[in-house]
Swiss-Prot record:
Protein name per UniProt: Deoxycytidylate deaminase
MF terms in GO: 5-hydroxymethyl-dUMP N-hydrolase activity; dCMP deaminase activity; zinc ion binding
Regulation: Allosteric enzyme whose activity is greatly influenced by the end products of its metabolic pathway, dCTP and dTTP.
Organism expressing this protein natively: Pongo abelii
Swiss-Prot/TrEMBL keywords: Allosteric enzyme, Hydrolase, Metal-binding, Nucleotide biosynthesis, Phosphoprotein, Zinc
Lineage of producing organism: Eukaryota, Metazoa, Chordata, Craniata, Vertebrata
Subunit structure, as described in the record: Homohexamer.
GO-annotated cellular components: cytoplasm
Cofactor (UniProt): Zn(2+)
Amino acid sequence: MSEVSCKKRDDYLEWPEYFMAVAFLSAQRSKDPNSQVGACIVNSENKIVGIGYNGMPNGCSDDQLPWRRTAKNKLDTKYPYVCHAELNAIMNKNSTDVKGCSMYVALFPCNECAKLIIQAGIKEVIFMSDKYHDSDEATAARLLFDMAGVTFRKFIPKCSKIVIDFDSINSRPSQKLQ
């Protein structure tokens, strides 16, 4: 009888990497040509309770609304129309509420999303990028989070890439239970 390894593999994804990867994978659904942002809401039991990405509102054609960042008229840009990933994750929640949950998000939230996060009862925001740190919107978001007691921190990944290889399921040798 051959001996099957009893030791677990040590290269598995830990929870934080898994949740941030889900946020990044969700971002791939965004049709925005400039910014693809995803968000993943997790409860205290490490269960995903909401996922979202930036996109146009339900029922509004993303072929008819603008995706540009700049124009003479603000109505000809995406900004008055697009729903941010944080909003969509909260609206897509699969539980009665998200009070006390954590949100993993690719980009530090703007002030409008900060208000939604606070009102939803989310207590922690883990973000990957803070590239708009000095903007008024990010400054206001930090102030609101501090006042409401929402903690926020930059995500420090243990690896720089997570590869999804659909062919890998067929390349691993199968093990038969004996």
